[in-house]
Amino acid sequence: MAKIAIMGFGTVGSGVLEVCRRNAASIARRAGEPVEVKYILDVRDFSGSPDAALFTKSIDTILNDPEIKVVVETIGGTKFAYPYVRRCLESGRSVCTSNKEMVATYGAELLALAKEHSAAFLFEASVGGGTPIITPMHQCLAANHISSIRGIVNGTTNFMLTKMKRENMGFDEALKIAQQLGYAETKDPGDDVDGRDACRKIAILASLACGHHVYPDNIPTRGIRDITVADIKAAEKLDSAIKLIAWYNEGGDGQMAAGVEPMLVSNSNQLAGVDDVFNAVLMKGDMLGDVVFYGKGAGKLPTASAVVADVIDALKEGVKVHDSLFWKPAEKPEGLLEDRNTYPWYLRVTGVAAALLPSVAGAGHVVFEDNGEAAYLVDAATSADIAAVTEKIEVLGGKVALDMKKLED
């Protein structure tokens, strides 16, 4: 029998215990032996729990038990999770995690440490929750060079944008509903609505795609706080939907760029029809072409099932998994990984008449003008062009309240 430990007994950690028990027979068949949770590390008091005997407040309990071969990390964050995971890997124990912040920040280091100590460091649940993305990418697509990734990887903001579109609802009201349903944090929803969650996820995918560590701090990131009902309606006029897109590009010259930002997505694009809490990631391989991964990006049991799948792989394959699941450390570059490509560009402007926008912003057309506010779609521009347009509008006494690229097919 394989004995494992869980560090952190929140939503996902408790889900891991539930999955291990409910699907014990199928897990044993796939792992080649029964899998049992022997310890749960959590500093809170669970003395009234039916599983009270499993709980410990000390990681040394886990590290001093030679029966523990795999440790599940679902603490979250990096303050405690990172040093605990390091100690587990240094002891030769494999670690399976759903912690996107830790993987995005320390992934290269922890992968190398695992390899050094003949262990596995697995993190399927860190990007797609219960939707498989990491394993297909480093195994099934291993013969492909991935040059482009576009994705909706945050279910909370996608739910909010869907609500805003379907029910003519503002940002604040959509956020309140997302919080009531448990999709967004009540105290600080910033990780979701400001794009930080999506940034960490695209950093992980970009690192896998290019083979070296991509730092989240180098990825330009914007959320959806500035999106209004007027923008939603303008998108519909333009046969598009507004989505928070996490993206990665590698150009022919080897230069890479990445970002997280709201975009106008043409209805002809597969991502435009991804609604509610669903996620989708579109990748372009040089041999396969386009491939799409689609499913719910979060949730207790979907995410826990992905973690347990990693546990099975760690028990069966161990260090062999790292033959393809690996990226190298890299020095942190200065500045941001800016996109230099040309796109149609949506501008919502205040304080400047719509009639002046063609001469200021270049060729394009007015989408709407109402109550001192106007929206204009520039036919083609780079981010540098838009920065220059923004300066011109400010000189005229106006302001660019929102700018978005338009993503075509």
Predicted ranges, named:
Residues 173-273, 278-280:
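Substrate-binding/catalytic subdomain of NAD(P)-dependent oxidoreductase enzymes
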Residues 68, 115-197:
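Rossmann-like NAD(P)H-binding beta-loop-alpha module
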Residues 1-91:
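N-terminal glycine-/serine-/threonine-rich beta1-alpha1-beta2 phosphate-ribose binding loop
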Residues 55-56, 73, 96-98, 121-125, ...:
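General beta-strand structural signal in soluble alpha/beta enzymes
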Residues 148-150, 158-161, 165, 183-190, ...:
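Catalytic, metal-anchored helix/loop core of enzyme active sites in primary metabolism
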Residues 81-87, 91, 98-138:
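Rossmann-fold NAD(P)-binding glycine/threonine-rich loop
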Residues 311-409:
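A conserved regulatory-domain signal marking ACT and ACT-like small-molecule sensing domains
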Residues 7, 11, 15, 35, ...:
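Conserved active-site and cofactor/substrate-binding residues in soluble primary-metabolism enzymes
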